[in-house]
Amino acid sequence: MEEVEATLMKYMTFNSSCSYAGIANMLERHGLDTSDRSIAIGMKLPYLFFRCNGIYLSGPMLQEAKWFNLYLNPIGYELSEKMMPADEAAAYLKAQETAMLGIRTGNTGKHAVVYTGTRADRLVFLNNKWESEEAPDEIQLTVDELKQKLDPTVVVATLQQVSPKSVSFTDKLQESIAGLAQSFTSLQQELLCALRQEPEQCILLNENISMDRLQTSAQSYAVL
């Protein structure tokens, strides 16, 4: 699709919020004025904590559609994600009005950018960045240049307008509580190992052990 000029660039206002600023930029192209911070607050980001494949995720590291839709669904939008080989991404993007994906940027890992259209033989992306950052607001890439900046398999997110629907935070908050409990157990285990100063004798704690027992155990080892 041909490039559609955005009326206002939405910048990052907190660390690692490029995908959140990206959602704000996509909504801007639909005529909605919001910000990365408003999105984070609207989806109750400070209270979300998730454990996936043994890794604890929170804050702006929660970047999947299921998290963003906590904010988007009530205002009548939904984010969808499509996985595809890198060499199919350019053609897919050209069929969209706007889309978001992660590209490699030097040694800083992946960075979320928003596709806005084409200019001559280049795909044009909004560079979700800090306003004070010395980097261009736009990134223009040929098809080959884009492919070089993508992982072999890429996830492209698109935004669709839907009927507004309410969302329940109950399940997500319960998941957060469970994740925090698991994190606490892991932390206590590391604490006990450190207090013993004998890693080979590290006690493997049961995930269901009570907080009182953990605290008592830690206090006991503290006097050894």
What are these regions (language model features)?
Residues 1-34, 194-223:
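A generic N-terminal leader/anchor concept
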Residues 2-14, 20, 24-29, 44-160:
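Conserved active-site-adjacent core of cysteine acyl-enzyme catalytic domains
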Residues 35, 84-85, 168-172:
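Alpha-helix capping and helix-coil boundary motifs
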